[in-house]
Curated annotation (Swiss-Prot):
Species assigned in the record: Psychrobacter sp. (strain PRwf-1)
Tagged with keyword Cytoplasm: no
Keywords of the record: Hydrolase, Metal-binding, Metalloprotease, Protease, Zinc
Pfam family, one: UPF0758_N
GO molecular function: metal ion binding; metallopeptidase activity
Family, as annotated: Belongs to the UPF0758 family.
Domain of life: Bacteria
Name listed for the protein in its UniProt record: UPF0758 protein PsycPRwf_0491
Length: 226
């Protein structure tokens, strides 16, 4: 049965408008973005099949283009709608944080960074520049590496932070197709950068690693040197 033939109170759009987003399942939210299903499936059924196949909305949005387009019922138009929804969320978060909402909680930081770099197929290294109140001054990917490593220039990180007038920074990188467990090289870089920051009265607040299914905070897990 097509969604338009459902009782009004069961239709995702009507539920969203009448009750609020918190009353919708992940599949119902996704169905609204998909707008239509296929000849064999309603938008809800298509959304459920995508979530089941990839393991969740986050995993779907992080999946390679080829993997998503290989799913029955998904063409380039629907894939573009999914990418646009992700980009809208990223831009909303960026706008909110730059308008004065501070990164004063570890989960907020992890959520923000995860949306920024989780889809990257190569390892990237990013820097968040913050003022004393933990308000975001600037976010930038400074280095792009390969599938399993990324060379980082400590001097360039410090120069960028000073140019932005930062009082403190948070660094972040991803582990494409791996978990978020920090390597010995990750820990060594963090220790080196923390000492370099202290030498110029700049605080390194945290190091975030975005893995395949997890995001890790050095500060939250008391990983050296925090």
């Amino acid at each position: 049965m097509a969604i338009k033939d459902w009782h009004e109170e069961d239709r995702p759009r009507e539920k969203l408008l009448n009750l609020g987003a918190e009353y919708l399942t992940d599949a119902e939210i996704l169905a609204i973005f998909l707008r239509t299903g296929s000849k064999q499936q309603s938008a809800i059924e298509l959304a459920r099949s995508l979530i089941d196949h990839f393991g969740g909305i986050a995993e779907l949005l992080a999946a390679p283009k080829e993997a998503v387009l290989a799913c029955h019922g998904i063409g380039t138009a629907k894939y573009a709608q999914l990418l646009a929804s992700l980009e809208m969320g990223k831009r909303y978060l960026n706008s909110e944080l730059k308008s004065g909402n501070s990164l004063n909680r570890s989960q907020v930081v992890k959520d923000y960074i995860t949306t920024q770099i989780r889809r990257e197929s190569k390892e990237v290294f990013a820097v968040l520049c913050l003022d004393n109140g933990l308000n975001l001054l600037d976010y930038k990917v400074l280095f792009v590496g390969g599938l399993s490593s990324c060379s980082v220039c400590v001097k360039q990180v410090l120069r960028h932070a000073l140019e932005q007038g930062a009082s403190q920074i948070i660094i972040a990188h991803n582990h494409p197709n791996q978990d978020a467990t920090p390597s010995a090289a990750d820990i060594h870089l963090t220790q080196t950068l923390k000492l370099a920051c202290e030498a110029i009265d700049l605080r390194l607040t945290d190091h975030i690693i975005v893995g395949r299914n997890q995001t890790l905070s050095f500060a939250e897990t008391a990983t050296a040197p925090f």
